[in-house]
Amino acid sequence: MSLEESEVKHIAHLARVAIEADDIPGYARNLSDILDFVEQMKDIDTSGVTPMAHPLDAVQRLREDEVTEPDQRERFQAIAPATEAGLYLVPRVIE
């Protein structure tokens, strides 16, 4: 699949990427190569392949959750400049 210069410019615009005019042919070649590779992958028969979420069949060893610090929420709420319904009130930064 060969991309036109206008298509490369459109892709760059959508990606909000500024590219130089003299770099467009190189980007067109690279993107065309990538799209050709994707087309080749689409032609591969994967009917006998089991779908998987990760290539390695590894199990994560997770530790049990345990409290490591005392709950100091009330203390922090008491010294906060402003709170409401258990939430910290902060100055508005977006108008």
Swiss-Prot record:
Enzyme category, top tier: ligase
Record's catalysed reaction(s): L-glutamyl-tRNA(Gln) + L-glutamine + ATP + H2O = L-glutaminyl-tRNA(Gln) + L-glutamate + ADP + phosphate + H(+); L-aspartyl-tRNA(Asn) + L-glutamine + ATP + H2O = L-asparaginyl-tRNA(Asn) + L-glutamate + ADP + phosphate + 2 H(+)
Keywords, comma-separated and alphabetical: ATP-binding, Ligase, Nucleotide-binding, Protein biosynthesis
Domain of life: Bacteria
Annotated EC: 6.3.5.-
Example GO molecular function: glutaminyl-tRNA synthase (glutamine-hydrolyzing) activity
GO biological process, alphabetically ordered: glutaminyl-tRNAGln biosynthesis via transamidation; regulation of translational fidelity; translation
Signal peptide: none
Subunit structure: Heterotrimer of A, B and C subunits.
PANTHER family per record: GLUTAMYL-TRNA(GLN) AMIDOTRANSFERASE SUBUNIT C, MITOCHONDRIAL
Record's function text: Allows the formation of correctly charged Asn-tRNA(Asn) or Gln-tRNA(Gln) through the transamidation of misacylated Asp-tRNA(Asn) or Glu-tRNA(Gln) in organisms which lack either or both of asparaginyl-tRNA or glutaminyl-tRNA synthetases. The reaction takes place in the presence of glutamine and ATP through an activated phospho-Asp-tRNA(Asn) or phospho-Glu-tRNA(Gln).
Homology family: Belongs to the GatC family.
Protein name stated in the entry: Aspartyl/glutamyl-tRNA(Asn/Gln) amidotransferase subunit C
Source species: Alkalilimnicola ehrlichii (strain ATCC BAA-1101 / DSM 17681 / MLHE-1)
